[in-house]
Amino acid sequence: MSGRSRLFEVKQRVREVNIERKQHAPGQILSGTSYFFSELSQNPTLAVDFPIAPPQMAHYMECSTRIYSIYMKYVAPEDIVVYSIDEVFMDITDYLPASGMTAREFARKIILDVMDTTGITATAGIGTNLFLCKVAMDIVAKHLPADEYGVRIAFLDEMTFRQKLWAHQPLTDFWRIGHGYARKLAENGLFTMGDIARCSVKNEDMLYRLFGKNAELLIDHAWGFEPCTVPEIKAYKPETNSISSGQVLHCPYETDKAKLVLKEMADQLALDLVNKKIVTDQIVLTVGYDIENLSDPSRRSAYHGSIETDRYGRSIPKQAHGTQNLDDYTSSSHRIMNAAVDLFDRLIDPTLLIRRLYIVANHIIPEDTALQKKDRFTPVSYTHLRAHETSLH
């Protein structure tokens, strides 16, 4: 299995393996379970098992914050781009001369500091641009043997990328190539980055017909190029601003239970608005349903709505998605929560099990800007609103 398999994929594969083990077990009987390879190898009557750790996002966020503070001992915040809870990009170009270290030595020093401070090992990709850094980490470093301290570091430049990874498969291992892109490329006989690069020389127009303006970035990446830099990312100002919150529920939820989670998410979203001194005039909600709605025969027979296929090829009820405009700009927890619940009640099928919730506060602007829109938002009403919000929290 791949190193980033989904839980349902692991369960499915383990079920298949245990069917095979049962067929070859004495008397076709499995007497117990184990998740230790040595025990499973020696005892054919044991079924494969594995522990499932419940997610602890608050703990993960705390660890991520601690690790980021370690990064700042070596690199200034303006040279760090936080990509996810466990990944960052760093531009260390100007730090190497003063440190007297190579890029690999510099990265290793940071990684060892993280391990000494938190006990967490890290992997690094070094490259001549952002794309090569990401690919060096995702594809090359993660498959290298760790040193005595658990450190894995890989380097790529444009030429070594072409030498090592032009023939690599699957394409979905590469940053920014999803299953949809890979499927469309395969339909046109392109299965590797090398294929894409060669196609860009011989038949570039085909790539633009398939992907529009996004073909430009795809072609750049196929050759190991990346035009975007860390300073450009830090300077970027999006035309449309929003903040969001999403949850994948750890098990299928009935409507009432999912609504309670949504209320908590809406309340937290409003608190984020207040803390950041911004306001919104639109709430967007997306509700994703669980596969059990169609895999359970009794539920399947009762459902007559639209069906879509997820990225793993599974059939699920079509997700619910909608927008609720607010009367004016606000950061009121009460108003945002009510809007989210009204939207939820209007959109969802109450007979279906829910697995994902995603809420967005759209069109966000600073409080001061909202105050200037006197035709929509008066200073008096806003002062009253902020006082009410403060009392709620």
Report the location of each language-model feature:
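Gly/Gly-Pro- and Ser/Thr-rich, intrinsically disordered tail segments characteristic of DNA damage-repair
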Residues: 1-220, 227-230, 377-386, 391
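DNA-contacting surface of Y-family translesion DNA polymerases
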Residues: 173, 181-354, 366-378
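Broad gene-expression machinery/nucleic-acid interaction feature
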Residues: 87, 121, 282-284, 356
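Short, internal active-site loops enriched in acidic
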Residues: 93-95, 128-133, 287-294, 362-368
